[in-house]
């Protein structure tokens, strides 16, 4: 199935148009007030950036809904009429059948337009498992040839799922409602990534999470332990287990690597979810405890939706806060009063899931994004009225051109101060939340500018353009709030009489002893060392991370060796520059991967590499690459290496800026030069990679210009450079040449060349 296509189930009889177009709808440029109504400042800005998430986001659109919320029974939406005008919550059945590791992404339009910004990108995740038998309590363990446990490869589960329309960044825990008028409505789905099978589409009232009214005591001695590295499934293939040599974790071995925690670096984005299988022997109420750490947000919690059997039991499990803990600590879920939260469970198999939630910080994120947009607007306006001359001794009164500019910035600072106060709700013991330090810096900076707004003439960079500007500090905070790195060692469900079975962290003396043991065992067998290999096997040295190497070795052992009968030993390459010395000493590997593009030439001229053209299938393999990529590895008529990766430069642009200035996206450097005056008069610019090299310009940066102009580096032979080609004349014209100058290309006009 081609990318972007979709199939519809035969049972589907709804008014849905499956569109595969990739057209981009132009974002509207709106004139925005510098402040919300009700604030003291009266000034407005006329130079504004457009930001559809702010102008047309769900928060703003849903606040203007006029229809009542639908409260009836679920409606299977078929070709026909919607029974009444109301706010509906839409869910649909789907099966993501593409082989891609990426989630399916789709845009959903109602009656030909997107009701709000979040409808442009809907993520339809797949489920991934590492267990051959998905519903077994015995997970699959994979070990390398050294006896170390390695990360197992996840398998995609091809199964039907159901999902409501939600924000792809999961700033809303609950689904998003849409207004539908009574009568015929058309739903259009555009696939932007992947393929799927689409089933029933259903309109419902807003799903309700039961209100928490307190918990009953968990009487009994039941105890259930779940190791967090043993997933049942997860909704992102990138979520994986990891090994930490921490005695507080289970399992732990001093000499071997064992998977004993969820890698925090892989589990931190809003909406990511991990699910575990558990078996309850005794029905009853259970408390839930987690052995976890999260040191990503200093003094601020990470929020989770804890689900039992796929549902949030009550509001105490929704957006539950997990406090900042740099070291692994045991935590039992408690309510706002500090009482333990219990959950009733029947005997049998159940699932427990943890989904990262962003809803508690949504309003803070929206406030910060709004202020950033307005600071951008003000920066444009200041540059418009004052130009780009940053003379400190230039007299200029901004109040005459932007009335209320000081009060405007003070109002933004007040809003940022409120953001900090809102954060303190989750950690009242702290006067200042360290994770929100950037907010305080930005607030103080705005207050400083507000006191003397005329200093903006030379302090304009402090608003939006420098690395220490207000907007940079706010952008840093957004990155911090979006990061929720969460490491999980284990989950426990227990009853009152089994509380003593909860493991405690090791004491300092035990940790010291285990540290000594770990130190001495490190002098033993060195896994993936070039000295610890079988000379009868193919030796491959890899200049990449250990995890990358482990996955390579796993794939080789499972696929390559059984198919070819060739045994392969991989080893970590400590220093790629030592390959030349290794060749001199006779200890060089058979194959080296991940090395810099310059290394093959150094080895080739020393006769240390085999000519790849001698292999019978070389021509077939070489056709997979662009010929230019092989050039650095050619010496004479021999080729000594093939590229493993390819880097290339792409252009990205700010569509909101171009829309505001009425400029088109440039296709040529001439068009870039033509738009530079419009950009630079507003303090903006166009970046080209040659700017990063102050002195000598490298071929990496300059050859794209040369080749795009029809030029060439060599004239038939590699030893004759010809940077004086017709391409230079085509670009600059004959009038650029003079008899008293020696310029590239001008020799083509001399009589001896005619």
How would you describe each model-predicted region?
Residues 2-13:
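Bacterial N-terminal signal peptides that target proteins for export
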Residues 188-189, 590-594, 688, 743:
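Paired acidic/hydrophobic, glycine-rich loop segments that form the ligand-binding mouth/hinge
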Residues 20-36:
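Sec-dependent signal peptide cleavage junction
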Residues 558-625, 632, 656-664:
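Extracytoplasmic "Venus flytrap"/periplasmic binding protein-like
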Residues 35-486, 491:
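Extracytoplasmic
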Residues 513-534, 597-650, 671-675, 701:
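Hinge/lid segment of periplasmic solute-binding proteins
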Residues 533-546, 560, 566-571, 591, ...:
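Short, well-ordered beta-strand elements
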Residues 570-571, 613-616, 634-700, 705-751:
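Helix-loop-helix "hinge/cap" segment bordering the ligand-binding cleft or interdomain interface
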